[in-house]
Amino acid sequence: RTDDDFTPVTMETVTSESGTQFEGALPKQPAAGKLQYYIEAEIAGQARRFPEQADQFVLIRFKDPVPDGVLIPHVTLMIISILLGMRSGLSALFAPYNMKQLAWATLCGMTVGGMILGPMVQKYAFGEYWTGFPLGGDWTDNKMLFMFLAWVFACSVVGLNPRKKNTTTGRIAVFTATIVMTVCYLIPHSMGGSDLDYSQVDKGGDPSKAIETGRK
């Protein structure tokens, strides 16, 4: 975070096959660095501001590039995991005949997508494998940890034997894991994420060593 004043950047008119548009370049920031900006323009003779409220700004966060070979499987498996998790919860409520298989499939997808590929994405993007508990306060990592532990608990309750009769306790455990997962997914993905401490950078510090992890 910094108290620096806004720096004006003049937008340029760019014409292409798709039409004419205004473009302006924002200065690139180190990984986890953030910029706030707003746009002022004159449209039909009237001054306009975007966003309209004077105390509101657009916030963007920068990251280092993540290889598609890591990012795409991570995103795909996390989407599949939440779909399987929701299906597991419905199965626990109404038709638990395949609840165990669905719960274990959810845990497997979350293990590979979230606990293995997730830290790899974090390492490429922000330079650290894990910035959640107990190493830091990154909300995204902590959400992943809560979801993972919820499904580990649910699967430990229902067990591996597909022939073993489903119990009320097992159904409650699976449904609870679904609720925990749903609540975690409702929290915005980047909330409480890695944040660059510009005060350290201004003192000449290495930007990769000046990344906070959500505790502040």
Describe each region flagged by the PLM.
Residues R1-I80, G85-Y97, P162-R163, T167-T178, ...:
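Glycan-association/targeting regions that enable binding to alpha-glucans and other polysaccharides
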Residues Q46-P65, V112-G127, T182-S199:
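C-terminal ends of transmembrane alpha-helices
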Residues D64-G136, N142:
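Conserved, compact domain cores that house catalytic/ligand-binding motifs in diverse enzymes
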Residues E128-T131, L135, T140-K216:
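Generic detector of multi-pass transmembrane helix bundles and their immediately adjacent loops
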